[in-house]
């Protein structure tokens, strides 16, 4: 038994899609969520900047006395060295690669992600560790995150933008598409409509949530309470964050606190 909370962080609202899955699988846990809304998006930032941001956020999480941290940001997962940190870390990118390799039948997988994640080739590397015969086609969709952060994920402009970005992958005969950024599940209905029913859309957060549960069970670290709570911290704008959080989690969000993350 361990009553400490689980930490989750992302560049903005995207990680809320991961929090939603975690609450579904582990409703008794308490959660500390940090959204770096001041510095979003991460996708076009340098590797050095992202590493610095991750260090600051993990220092903040350590101060919150969390028992584990879920990195709900594929871009961060793609560039940091997890072994440098003395906290248990769960990697959304690794979970996505494992899920995609499991689902594909024709061994043709598409990955949409931020520019930085695509350039790192982290998905391709992780998928090919599992099965070197799988073909991986990656496409950067940098326009998605700004739209989602503004709450425009189901708008006509979202459909138009997604159609342009996905055109190349539609021509590759993929049967599996990884949403390689935790913001992208907010556009899942748009993406599914464009790709068609024959393409399996993979949300890495589903497997990730079960990975966390398996770890807590194995280490006897589960919180025994029936229903936990979530606390939210942001570095910048609260308004769109609260709106998206309430829509995703289906409840009123009042405890969103501002934190000066750069002091960490």
From Swiss-Prot:
GO terms for biological process: cell wall organization; peptidoglycan biosynthetic process; regulation of cell shape. Pathway: Cell wall biogenesis; peptidoglycan biosynthesis. The active site is at 73 (proton donor/acceptor), 181 (proton donor/acceptor). Its EC number is 5.1.1.3. Substrate binds at residues 10-11, 42-43, 74-75, 182-183. Keywords: Cell shape, Cell wall biogenesis/degradation, Isomerase, Peptidoglycan synthesis. The keyword Cell wall biogenesis/degradation applies. It catalyses: L-glutamate = D-glutamate. Pfam families: Asp_Glu_race (PF01177). One of its GO terms (molecular function) is glutamate racemase activity. Provides the (R)-glutamate required for cell wall biosynthesis. Belongs to the aspartate/glutamate racemases family. This is Glutamate racemase. It comes from Thermoanaerobacter sp. (strain X514).
